Amino acid sequence: MNEKDFVKLCKQTVAKYANEHLDKSDGKQINEDDVFIVWMCKTLQNSKALVSTTLFDGMYYELTYNGNKKELYLDAYKKFQNVCISVDG
């Protein structure tokens, strides 16, 4: 799968997943334009992307494409906390 097709697949998959898990009473839905790639790489036939949306829900997604099996894996994470830790150099 080339980069363009992988990006499109990631955006479609995350938009669909997010819409299926949003609070239905809010009436909010997103589309591919509300999904963005934070980081992406390709090694041999495999691809991985870290993805987020414009929603303020703290969700973060990791998508991995296994080129051998032609399978896409989705991991969904929710940000719990962000802390600064001072490290002595």
Language model features: what each stretch is:
Residues D34-E71:
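Amphipathic, interaction-prone secondary-structure segments
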Residues M1-L44:
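N-terminal non-globular leader segments, chiefly Sec-dependent signal peptides
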Residues K69-G89:
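A short, surface-exposed interaction/processing loop segment used at functional sites
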